[in-house]
From Swiss-Prot:
This is Leucine--tRNA ligase. It is an enzyme of class 6 (ligase). A motif ('KMSKS' region) lies at residues 619-623. A motif ('HIGH' region) lies at residues 44-55. It comes from Borrelia recurrentis (strain A1). InterPro entries: aa-tRNA-synth_I_CS, aa-tRNA-synth_Ia, Leu-tRNA-ligase, Leu_tRNA-synth_edit, M/V/L/I-tRNA-synth_anticd-bd, Methionyl/Leucyl_tRNA_Synth, Rossmann-like_a/b/a_fold, tRNAsynth_Ia_anticodon-bd. Its EC number is 6.1.1.4. It is found in: Cytoplasm. One of its GO terms (cellular component) is cytosol. Keywords: Aminoacyl-tRNA synthetase, ATP-binding, Cytoplasm, Ligase, Nucleotide-binding, Protein biosynthesis. Coiled coil: none annotated.
Amino acid sequence: MSKYDFKKIEKKWQNYWDKHKTYKVNEDPNVPKEKRIYILDMFPYPSANGLHVGHPEGYTATDILTRYKLLNGFNVLHPMGFDSFGLPAENYAIQTGKHPKKITEKNIEKFKEQIKALGFAYDWDREIKTHDVNYYKWTQWIFLQLYKKGLAYTKEIPVWYCPDLGTVLANEEVIQTPDGPRSERGFHKVERKPLRQWLLKITKYAERLIRDLEEVDWPDSVKEMQKNWIGKSTGVEIEFLIKESKEKIKVFTTRPDTIFGVTYLVLAPEHPMVDKITKDELKPIISKYKDKEILKSDLERTSLEKDKTGIFTGAYAINPITKEEIPIWIGSYILGTYGTGAVMSVPAHDERDFEFAKKYNLPIKQVVSQTGTNEVLIKPFTENGISINTPTEFNNLKTIEVKTKVIKWLIENKMGQEKVNYKLRDWIFSRQRYWGEPIPILFDDNLNEIPLNDDELPLTLPDIENYKPSGTGESPLSKIKDWVNVKRNGKIYKRETNTMPQWAGSCWYYIRYLDPHNEKEFANKEKINYWMPVDLYIGGAEHSVLHLLYARFWHKVLYDLGYVNIKEPFRKLINQGMITSFAYQDENGILIPNDEVEKKDNKFFSKKNNKELKQIIAKMSKSLKNIINPDDIIKEYGADSMRIYEMFMGPLTDSKPWNTQGLIGIFRFLNKIWLIKNKELTNETPPKEIISELHKTIKKVTEDIETLNFNTAISTLMIFINELLKHEKNYLKIFRPISIILSPFAPHLGEELWEFMGEQSSIFKNAKWPKYDLNSIIDDTREIVLQVNGKTKDKIMIKKDTDEKTLKKIAFNNQKIIQNINNKQIIKIITVKDKLVNIVAK
């Protein structure tokens, strides 16, 4: 009797797939559109740390679906590549003294080795790397299309500059902390600094980026995050005349009904009217205030927690409806980049205005209340309500009615117009770093921009020794004079020395997979039409705003230019949950590294002081030493065990803690299948009961894969395998279909079993997914509830009349039950036949 030698089996089939290019795909014109599918993982950044067990979760999910679709006769595109430009490689290069290109390519080799060891069905002939010159040539080409369309421009703006990283960061790459703004990557201090930057006019696409979310099957949470980031506001733009002047100040508001409660105007420090209206005696102090405030971040200035500051300009405006004179202030909490850079302040009905008015003793006039009567205002009333203290024609009306009447009055009197505003800012697209795509633009002596011609691409990143940041805000490329200075038509021009951000290459990589070796165009249109859109895109929720928003923007530009055939690139999006790990906390809440923890009698103690620790679930991190390396898992249990365990841990979209005990259970499951394989193989007709169970299993596994409920599909397979073990013989009519439906989850074992049954070629080329027959199914299953302390944790299907001992065993092997009773004392177990198992624990 042979043993399950997973190391030998997995190496054998990985070599076979490589040699025979089993997963190579082409654009077969005979395959109808409904039988084509494009399944995509968010490609990884190849860090020096390699993969951890969290990476393969999404990859395994797409791989299972890919193999399932192959077995159902689909033409499947399932590629992989590497997002290999960007700051991390450059920072690591600076730390180690090794060139970022060498580091990156070494890391990619390691990643590929790890990915291949997990047996994923990628078409490696389509591999892309964003730092490859044959790839970034087309990133540069797309940038030039944006430039020619008027969507790329330069401007000197206050930007986030990180001295430690030596580069400018986009707003999205900066986080606010109690100690001030920090870089998201590396947690370095950042400051505001005026620099000439490239920007992309993503704001031109704001409305479409919101509207077209209706066309995609994405999680509602991701759609909301994108909508909130874009920040659409519908309101009215109102003109306020300045007293004793012909000048006007325009303000944007979403609450025109509150115009009767305006007691002052506030301008952003950078508003162009500030210098015009400020009284001479106040100009020195206001100039100093302006210089200080405009270097602060948007978040610093607008945060509700921050103290609001301001200065009176000495000027007054006239309320267009009430004709009241109101003072004009400048205030830190108003941004020049949002709306008009001016706000009509209604402190009775806005939190920030209320704080500002209280601080500077400005009038507070209530014009809306919940009941339609005056109320004592402890805090501003910001809801809709009934108008009060307003002219007769507007008084005692609901908010929506007042809004309508005010807008109508303003439009008729040419003092306002309806308007839509967005919080979204143009995308800062340049970085003062080396390891990125060179921007294909020249400048003459007058700083006029000259785009490179298509035949001058790629503009190759020069191979240099000193790629450290200059410290002045200039790129390291600025020091390479023979690269920077370009002679053309007898004149000397200078190259743009900034590089593109790390997001550039990932904005369009899903298109290059369709035609990765094309030297004449970024992708052949027929191939784009054949495969697009991406049918399923799986990746982390951390990319909900940046990558997905930027990729959608570039795609829409390419759509407008006629290069792609659909409006949205990713039809369906799934965010896999995070795989966490156990961590240990002392009495002060401090996390203790795992190698300083020991277990005694199901409790955890510090090795240093023997004090008891609390076990919690936390994100894997190097400092806590709780990162699980997939190489170790594969070596000990095999790739198939790891793949199945990651899918069995819980629903794909849930976060769940890694528990090696659960992995051991999966390893036993695969060994059970091997035990069945070792039994006498027979062509005899199986008993009706087994045939019924087989068709139930095929039905459930089929439905679960289609809906990406892999954990319940695996559970169903486990139940059926346990059933088969009870029989002395191995029925070919059962073992053949069960091997096929197992193979997407455990492809190496699936191939080995297929060969064992006498087949010559790959199961994924030669087998067909089995059909279930409803007429063969005998309904002898029951749904039971699994509870902990009377609270339902899961519902599962079991065989009717399952005995109490088996019920308990099923409950204690259930992942959700394991998570809820971990480290608890079991008081008693209550079972009700065919209905429930309730574990009482404390």
